[in-house]
Amino acid sequence: MMQRHAAIGSLLALALVSACKNEEPRGAAPPPPPAAKPAACAGGGGTLSDAQSAAFFPRTTAGFCLDPNGGDKTYGEGGSLPLDQICDMFDGECEIYKGFGVRRVVELRYVDGSGSAATIDVHLSKFGTTEGAYAMFTKRVVGDGDPAGEDTPRPIEGGGAAALGLGTAYLWRGAHLAEITYNDEAAAEPAIKALGDKLLAPLVKEIGAKLPGETALPPAAAALPEANRIPLGVRVVTKDLLGIPSTGGGAFGYYKDADKRYRFAVMVRADDEQAKDVLATLGKGPGAQKEKGIGDGAVRFMSKEGEAPAVEWIVARTGGRLVGIGDEVRVLRSGMTADEVAKVSLGKDEKIARLKDAIAKK
């Protein structure tokens, strides 16, 4: 009997061994991606196939080089790929780019000459106008957020304006916007930040010096008051800046004076008559009231964004330019008491005083 049990045990053991040999381990990690060649940059780096943008990018930068295997792609005007395919590249945000008038996009990358899998990925977009390119820059840097937030990119040197966030930099000049990202799946967030700061800032400065176009801001953004403005605290909106139909685009400026937060808004029109029409439209809203003694006419009204509390705006005209001052909705919340609102917002008289000062300086 014992011999029979031993034989059965041996057969079971053999069966288990055989089964283990035939089954793949479950939950095993996929094989790592192929590493870059240690001598990838030995030949001085690759070259770009897009003749329009090749001169903007150095072949080497801080131990990285343009991918010797090529792979750069051009979408839209003068490119081999249709512009609509940028939707795959920008995660479905192509309509935002199109709304700002994007004409072409070049995609390229730098590889690490030391052989790691790290890359510096670049998207260079060219827009139909300087205003469109700068508007997209401000959309990326500020967007719907608060430029005073800790996670907001900080200003760096380059082109007309540049910003550096966590492993990503943004560069604007003329009709161009460059978005430059340091990627390394093996690196933790602190390393991404440190290496991004080290690698991207000098690259942004170099590319910014080579891009064509003016570095002067579009007229509405340039007319924003500078005192108390938060670094990179500008947002250009090309359609209906204050959310009121038929009033057109312009620029917001974001400001902080001690605990007080507020915004300026500037809209520049072709002539006085167009500016008068905008002011008249603003004055037709529910509860809007005329204010005397400010510029060439002024109105006060309440504006509301989505679920956020309504905020007070006072907008004045001076020639073909409209300048407004309003509460900062990003620091307000539903249910705040009057005292809580007063701690972070300007009163009506304070708004009027700062508005008059802004008009007088421009």
Question: Each predicted region: which residue ranges?
Answer:
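Soluble, non-membrane globular domain cores that form compact, hydrophobic packing
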Residues: 20-121, 125-362
